[in-house]
Amino acid sequence: MTLRKSLLILCLVIWSSNFVFGQELNATVTIQSNKVDNQVDPKVFIQLQSQLKDFLNQRKWSNDIYGNEEKIECSFYITIESVLSPNVYNAKLSVVSNRPVYNSNYTTPVLNMQDANFTFKYQLSQPVEFNENKVQGTDPLEANLTATLAYYIYIILGLDYDSYELRGGAAYFNKALNVVYNAPEASGINGWKSYDGQRNRFILIDNLTKSGMDKIHEVIYSYYREGLDQMSTNFETSRGTILNALMTMQEVQDANTNTMVVPILLQGKYAEISGIFGNADKAMKKQLIATLSVIDIANLNKYKEKLE
C-alpha cells in the first residue's frame, strides 16, 4: 500500500462525514490565442479550454482514491503560435505542478516544463478523448492533443508518487512511456522521437525510466519526503538531507551529461534552495555552490549573490 493511499485511508476514517472523493488533479487550463485572433473564431478556444479542463479533472488517471485536499495542483498554459492549416494549430505548452510540504503552509514546485512542439487539430464540437490502448486514435493530429496532455499527466503523477514513496511513481512513468511508444505520427507532429531536438518527451521519459539513471528517483524521494517534509521537526538534519540529494543529483548529471531531467527538476527552485541554505554555515554553502555549479549553471550567479 502506498504512503499516499495510507494517508487517504486515515483521512477517510477521521473525516468521512465531510470528505468528498474524486479524481486526482485540480488542474487549471489557460489558452492564450491573441496571435491568431484575427484568423480563428474566439469561441473555438473558449470551448477547447473548457473541454480540456473537464478532460484533466474529471477523468480517473490512477487506481487510487483521492480526497479533495489530496488532489495535485497543476496548471496547463497553452499559447497558440500559428494556424498551420484549417483547424490545425502550432502551440507552446507550459506544465506546472506543485506539492504541499507537511506541517506547513508552503507549496513546493515539482514540475515546471515548457514544450515548444505542440501541434494539434481541433474544431468546435470535437470530442476530447484519450484511449491509452489506442493512443493514435483515428486522426493523429486530433489524437496528439490529448496524447500530449495525458503524457504530462502521467509525468506529474509519477513525480508526485516518487516524492512520497521511493520509486512510487514507476507505474505512471511506464504509462508515459507507453504514450511515447504509441504516439501519433503525422507531418508536423514533433516531440515524440529521440531526434526531435535536445529536449523532448522521448528524452524526458527515457531519463525517468532507464536503469542508468535510477538514482534520480532516490533524489526525488530524499529531497521531498526526507528533506522538505521533515523540516518542521528537524531543520538542520533535513537541510543536510536536501544537500545530499543535490549532490546525488550531481552524480546523475556527471554520469549522464546530456540529461534532461536534472534541469527540469531544478526549474523554479532557486528561491526555495537559496532560502533553505541562506543561514547555513560557510562549509555547507561552499559545498552547495560547488554542486550547483554543475547542476544549475544558469542560476549559479544568483545563488552566489545570495549565499556567498
Q: How would you name each of these model-derived features?
A:
Residues 35-42, 135-143, 254-255:
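Second-shell loop/turn segments in exported
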Residues 87-203:
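Acidic/His-rich structured neighborhood in mature extracellular/periplasmic domains
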Residues 30, 213, 217-308:
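A cross-kingdom marker for long, charged
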Residues 53-61, 154, 158-162, 274, ...:
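Sec-exported extracytoplasmic/periplasmic mature domains
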Residues 157, 164-258:
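Flexible, glycine-rich surface segments
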Residues 23-90, 101-103:
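Start-of-domain marker
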Residues 1-25:
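Bacterial Sec-dependent N-terminal signal peptides
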